[in-house]
Amino acid sequence: MSAVEAPSASQAIWPELTEDHPLSQLNSRLPTILSEAGHSQIWGVTLTYSTPPTFSTLIILQKFLRSVDNNVDEAATALGKTLKWRKDWGLDAPADKKEKENFGPDFEGLGYVTKIKKNDGGDEIVTWNVYGAVKDLKSTFGDLDRFLRWRVNLMEEAIAHLHLATTSTPIPDFNAGIDPHRMAQVHLYEGVSFLRMDPHVKAASKATIELMAANYPELLSRKFFVGVPLIMSWMFQAVRMFVSAETAKKFVVISYKENLANELGELEGVPKEYGGKGLSLGELQNQLRGEDAVTSS
């Protein structure tokens, strides 16, 4: 099978694929997967079957393959389920027909999406979950469906900034290199009591973890838990025992919020209260939205 050219940059090509390559095998199943799901859109990409495969389709297929160690059967099943889920949730409706949901004051200040310059010089999208901003636990977490829609909305905004449909950078095969199309995630626990676990919070946390694991594979590069009391850091160490080594490597526990900037990246992209030199989270988010608006116009 010939090398695949990126539609947005003719000079960028995907490494040549053999007929028995996992990507080639998964691509050959696309007609059935798309037909059974009744849906073909995901993360800004419209999946299409062709030989050779389109560059953006390979980006999506590679993420699903890497998430299951190149098991083609498992990747095909997972992709089909995710496409059906996205159809049911109406996540890929055209912008002019998609109503922007207003989640109200219960979610104000709880989530942000920004961009930083990593220590290695590359850009990275960051999602911020500010649990200390919750005003009323029941109002925010009590309606599980509404909470999950809010959390998915935050994730979808972050993914949009990855520009998966137009990238010209391929994803290496499983165990052959780092996926460059991922984001960091910061969980801020300042002001949160670790001594009691509200049942609504527990249910929302469990449902969110399951939903994200099933429908958003290979999208996180690093996961920071900030403001965790030293006495509770053992809990996160224990969690490492129950997840894969690859997932555990992404966990970074930080007890003092001022130490976050040194771990995350360039100081100008991190607010001052977290050890950086940047603007507030809201201002950094608006800055990113403005940059993308100019780029897409």
UniProtKB/Swiss-Prot annotation:
Keywords: Cytoplasm, Endoplasmic reticulum, Heme, Iron, Lipid transport, Membrane, Metal-binding, Microsome, Transport. It holds the Pfam family CRAL_TRIO. The keyword Transport applies. One of its GO terms (molecular function) is phosphatidylinositol transfer activity. It comes from Cryptococcus neoformans var. neoformans serotype D (strain B-3501A). It catalyses: a 1,2-diacyl-sn-glycero-3-phospho-(1D-myo-inositol)(in) = a 1,2-diacyl-sn-glycero-3-phospho-(1D-myo-inositol)(out). It comes from the Eukaryota. This is Phosphatidylinositol transfer protein SFH5. Non-classical phosphatidylinositol (PtdIns) transfer protein (PITP), which exhibits PtdIns-binding/transfer activity in the absence of detectable PtdCho-binding/transfer activity. Regulates PtdIns(4,5)P2 homeostasis at the plasma membrane. Heme-binding protein that may play a role in organic oxidant-induced stress responses. GO terms for cellular component: cortical endoplasmic reticulum; cytosol; endoplasmic reticulum membrane; plasma membrane. Residues 106-282 form the CRAL-TRIO domain. The keyword Cytoplasm applies. Belongs to the SFH5 family. The lineage of its organism: Eukaryota, Fungi, Dikarya, Basidiomycota, Agaricomycotina. It is a peripheral membrane protein. One of its GO terms (biological process) is regulation of exocytosis. It is found in: Cytoplasm; Endoplasmic reticulum membrane; Microsome membrane. Heme binds at Y131, R151, H187, Y189, K223. Its cofactor is heme b.
